[in-house]
């Protein structure tokens, strides 16, 4: 259960970061309304708060989170931006998740 909870927390954290960065990208690259910067800032604030909910040291959390970020970014690429994924995308995502698992599931030393 703990693994599922951590994985979901990583996924939600990644979504808030991607939304917080994608909306300004729309403003800058596609000339969308400046009002998109308001939900972008809110999303990034939620992202920062979510990072505090992870159960391990900040650096380790960021390292493990990176693997989930890669996967969520590729899902975003496919479903939001409409770009097809390649076998290299799938291979890279698999490797990133493996790295995340190694970091996140390591035995914790309390010394």
Swiss-Prot record:
Q: Which residues cross the membrane?
A: 8-28, 33-53, 65-85, 88-108
The name this protein goes by in its record? UPF0060 membrane protein HCH_03337
> Record's HAMAP family?
UPF0060
Chief localization class?
membrane
GO-annotated cellular components: plasma membrane
Entries under InterPro entries matching the protein:
UPF0060
Q: Of which family is this protein a member?
A: Belongs to the UPF0060 family.
Entry keywords, A to Z: Cell inner membrane, Cell membrane, Membrane, Transmembrane, Transmembrane helix
Task: Quote the NCBIfam families the UniProt record gives.
Answer: PRK02237.1
Q: Where in the cell is it found?
A: Cell inner membrane
The membrane-topology field of this record reads: Multi-pass membrane protein
Query: Superkingdom of the source?
Result: Bacteria
Asked if the record carries the keyword Cell membrane, the reply is: yes
């Amino acid at each position: 259960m703990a693994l599922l909870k951590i994985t979901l927390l990583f996924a939600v954290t990644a979504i808030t970061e991607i939304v917080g960065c994608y909306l300004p990208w729309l403003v800058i690259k596609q000339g969308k309304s400046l009002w998109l910067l308001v939900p972008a800032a809110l999303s990034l604030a939620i992202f920062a708060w979510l990072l505090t909910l992870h159960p391990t040291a900040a650096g380790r959390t960021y390292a493990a989170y990176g693997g989930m970020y890669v996967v969520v970014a590729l899902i975003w690429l496919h479903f939001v931006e409409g770009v097809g994924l390649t076998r290299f995308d799938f291979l890279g995502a698999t490797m990133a998740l493996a790295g995340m698992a190694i970091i996140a599931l390591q035995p914790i030393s309390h010394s």
